[in-house]
């Protein structure tokens, strides 16, 4: 499980969703929610910060039985408490719906 303590957020995704200004995201899967803190580090390119899912990511992995080789798919949803839809309006917590495809070929976890 130690290999799964951090998860890098692709630069394109973090720029599209304003992660430079965010401190946390909420992951939703199987009717449950996990708050995960973002750690920001300077990237190798000038003015390109990197966001990493840190504190809370390990709990998400453990609670869902994730293993090395499993693939997580994230879909950005509207901020928590702002109604239905697929657009983040910048208010409140940024919510990501998660689907996991297990490396062993089992049914996806949603």
UniProtKB/Swiss-Prot annotation:
InterPro entries: B3_DNA-bd (IPR003340), DNA-bd_pseudobarrel_sf (IPR015300), REM_fam (IPR039218). Disulfide bonds: none annotated. It is found in: Nucleus. The keyword Chloroplast does not apply. Signal peptide: none annotated. One of its GO terms (molecular function) is DNA binding. This is B3 domain-containing protein LOC_Os02g10420.
């Amino acid at each position: 499980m130690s290999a799964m303590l951090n998860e890098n957020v692709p630069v394109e995704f973090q720029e599209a969703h304003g992660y430079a200004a965010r401190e946390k995201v909420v992951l939703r899967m199987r009717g449950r929610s996990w708050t995960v803190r973002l750690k920001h580090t300077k990237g190798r390119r000038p003015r390109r910060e990197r966001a990493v899912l840190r504190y809370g990511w390990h709990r998400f992995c453990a609670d869902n039985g994730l293993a090395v080789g499993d693939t997580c798919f994230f879909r950005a949803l509207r901020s928590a408490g702002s109604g239905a839809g697929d657009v983040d309006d910048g208010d409140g917590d940024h919510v990501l719906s998660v689907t996991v495809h297990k490396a062993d070929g089992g049914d996806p976890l949603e």
